Amino acid sequence: MRHDSEDISLLVVHNISLPPGQFGGPYIEQFFLGELDANQHSFFKVIAKMRVSAHCVIRRDGEVVQFVPFHLRAWHAGVSSFAGRAKCNDYSIGIELEGSDVVPYTDAQYQALTELTQALMERYPHITLPRITGHQYIAPLRKTDPGLV
């Protein structure tokens, strides 16, 4: 639970593909739900016990899948800070684009991200254009996603 859902003031865009560089399939959902079978792929052995989540994933076809209600905390940012404030999970919403740093996102993803962002900005007025950022900017020594969105 967040201390104060009215404090939601940051939107963080990420990317994810499981296995890395591969799109489609059930693995992202399984990962966020803690149900990823480590035996399905060698990379999964590294991440299967991790407990992470995002509020939503936007698939390659533009489908938005929500995992965590927006007023609750998701575990997407890790060790992070924005504008001098640490612990971005406490006050942000995390959106994952199914993709990678080196493969362009689809038009359908951009459209869905635009619509979702507009709705979130209406619901959470402290999320303004300067407070929409990529994971690489809140955790610059650890992360490179979402790349050049």
What is each model feature region?
Residues 86, 91, 100-149:
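Basic/polar, cationic surfaces and motifs that engage anionic cell-wall
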Residues 1-86:
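N-terminal catalytic cores of peptidoglycan-degrading enzymes
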